[in-house]
Amino acid sequence: MLQALLIFVLQIIYVPILTIRTILLVKNQTRSAAGVGLLEGAIYIVSLGIVFQDLSNWMNIVAYVIGFSAGLLLGGYIENKLAIGYITYQVSLLDRCNELVDELRHSGFGVTVFEGEGINSIRYRLDIVAKRSREKELLEIINEIAPKAFMSSYEIRSFKGGYLTKAMKKRALMKKKDEHAS
């Protein structure tokens, strides 16, 4: 019984670590992923080793499987809270909606406006880049000002140039100045 509990706890720890390592790889953060992978591998070997010691012990196998499933739930929760990386939203509007563009820019989001031809009239598309940790804030602004907007989104693996890159460099310089002033 104690072994089954240990296996369950190890799986609850192992699977979220596996989730984080996978996310880091997808986000092109391979060094961090390798470091996390060391811990992941150690936990995996210990947990599976206990199960393989006695394959007739069904409680250990059940603990492994249930722990894995519970670990997936926990890993998904942690991933949503960490919100690593950036996301792009494409927002389609019937009119230019300068109020929305101004509010998004004022809030620090990178926004590019495109004019295009719809089936019946001119349409406008906003390309908005944001940190995933600010996605909720972004959606609240859009829904408040343009509740009928059509939106689609995708995660960004990497980017170069543009407003966000300049803003990040500026924040990094300000942080260094603050550290040296202290």
UniProtKB/Swiss-Prot annotation:
Protein localization: Cell membrane
Predominant location: membrane
Membrane topology, as annotated: Multi-pass membrane protein
Bridged cysteine pairs (disulfide): none
Annotated PANTHER family: UPF0316 PROTEIN YEBE (PTHR40060:SF1)
HAMAP family: UPF0316
Official protein name in the record: UPF0316 protein BC_3353
